[in-house]
């Protein structure tokens, strides 16, 4: 199975689940988890598929779901999961599995439906004499404006090298900024994927806000600046709640809150990771059986300590709290349960790989201090819409 996590706690958990499967399947000698770099995961996986050397199973980003399903490279898992002993197929929620279905088939299992959230370093806020995001949230004042203001202030006070950072964005993965622009009421394209929304007034407002946060306020690191919240480089970071695992051994006080409100109100965003079985695998049948084992009700409880499951019975703070010692029930309710209930997916498109590269290239003109935001976004649409 190809994965994009190198986290030891994740891999140890996967290997324990695999060992149980091997014990009950004498013809299976080994289950291996191949870590591919996050930044070029899909490219590396595609090379394996095109080269006739596919993995048996692989993780798939939600943004690439329509492409993989339309390409016909994934095995329909519905019958295998329905017939697996003690699986509880009907427990899978329609909302979580919708992206991975076509007709009556289920072509990947969304093992993680993980809301984006804002982690913060409470020690840095205390040093700067600022209210924490939790205090702002509870006062009804948790907004993108507050993020920008407090991000600039915590840097000005010398309490943090950087204010806030949209993790994994790095001025390359532009679609991660959906965590911001959804709060402005912006959409990257129409619901049928045929019309570009990148030049709409709401998107211009969102990108103007972000551009000013980077180049005027210096609240967010600029191009070429690396900032990792988890090693103390920033006071806040936008990332998925599953990243809480990276805080297990941290030496600073931290908290986590939902994404802030924008001019369009409260708009939460979720990301999904799914596991698919590849048709071209010589072990596709047993790979599907392993997937059924890995994601049965019992193992879903185990996975839930890092990856919010698509199971109705497990999506409540009390159950999630049993395997999430790092997060309080209140945090789980606010960020995970409510986020999954109300959140929308980050951008997906049947032609996403081409659009991702095209839009990234056009947005390069945005990342200078004197950029014409509206003109850049119009150019994005001029180039991207014909590809939709």
PLM feature segments, named:
Residues 101, 309, 330-383:
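C-terminal capping/gating helix-and-loop segments adjacent to ligand/active sites or protein-protein/ligand interfaces
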Residues 78-92, 135-139, 162-166, 186-205, ...:
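Short, solvent-exposed loop/beta-turn-alpha elements that line the ligand-binding surface or hinge
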Residues 62-117, 145-146, 255-257, 323-326, ...:
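Hinge/lid segment of periplasmic solute-binding proteins
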Residues 227, 242-245, 275-353:
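Mature extracytoplasmic/periplasmic domains
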């Amino acid at each position: 199975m190809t994965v994009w996590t190198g986290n030891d706690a994740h891999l140890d958990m996967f290997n324990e689940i695999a060992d149980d499967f091997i014990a009950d399947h004498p013809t299976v000698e080994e289950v291996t988890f191949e870590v591919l770099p996050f930044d070029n995961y899909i490219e590396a996986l595609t090379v394996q598929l095109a080269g006739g050397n596919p993995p048996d199973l692989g993780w798939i980003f939600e943004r690439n779901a329509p492409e993989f399903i339309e390409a016909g490279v994934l095995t329909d898992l519905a019958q295998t999961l329905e017939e697996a002993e003690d699986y509880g197929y009907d427990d899978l929620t329609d909302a979580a599995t919708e992206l991975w279905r076509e007709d009556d088939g289920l072509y990947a299992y969304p093992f993680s439906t993980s809301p984006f959230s804002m982690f913060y370093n409470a020690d840095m806020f205390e040093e700067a004499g600022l209210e924490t995001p939790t205090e702002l949230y509870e006062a009804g004042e948790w907004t993108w404006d507050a993020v920008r203001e407090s991000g600039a202030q915590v840097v000005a006070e010398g309490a943090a090298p950087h204010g806030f950072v949209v993790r994994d964005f790095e001025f390359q993965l532009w679609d991660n900024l959906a965590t911001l622009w959804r709060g402005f009421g912006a959409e990257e394209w129409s619901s049928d994927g045929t019309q570009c929304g990148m030049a709409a007034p709401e998107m211009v407002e969102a990108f103007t806000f972000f551009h000013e946060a980077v180049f005027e306020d210096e609240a967010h690191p600029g191009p070429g600046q690396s900032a990792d919240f988890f090693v103390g480089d920033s006071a806040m970071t936008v990332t998925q709640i599953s990243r809480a695992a990276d805080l297990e051994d941290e030496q600073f006080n931290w908290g986590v809150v939902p994404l802030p409100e924008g001019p369009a109100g409260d708009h939460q965003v979720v990301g999904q990771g799914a596991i698919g079985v590849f048709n071209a695998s010589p072990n596709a049948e047993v790979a599907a059986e392993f997937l059924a084992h890995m994601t049965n009700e019992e193992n879903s409880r185990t996975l839930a300590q890092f990856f919010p499951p698509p199971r109705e019975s497990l999506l409540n703070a009390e159950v999630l709290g049993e395997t999430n010692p790092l997060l309080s029930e209140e945090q789980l309710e606010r960020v995970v349960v409510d986020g999954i209930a109300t959140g929308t997916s980050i951008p997906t498109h049947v032609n996403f790989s081409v659009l991702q590269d095209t839009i990234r290239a056009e947005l390069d003109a945005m990342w200078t201090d004197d950029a014409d935001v509206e003109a850049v976004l119009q150019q994005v649409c001029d180039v991207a819409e014909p590809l939709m």
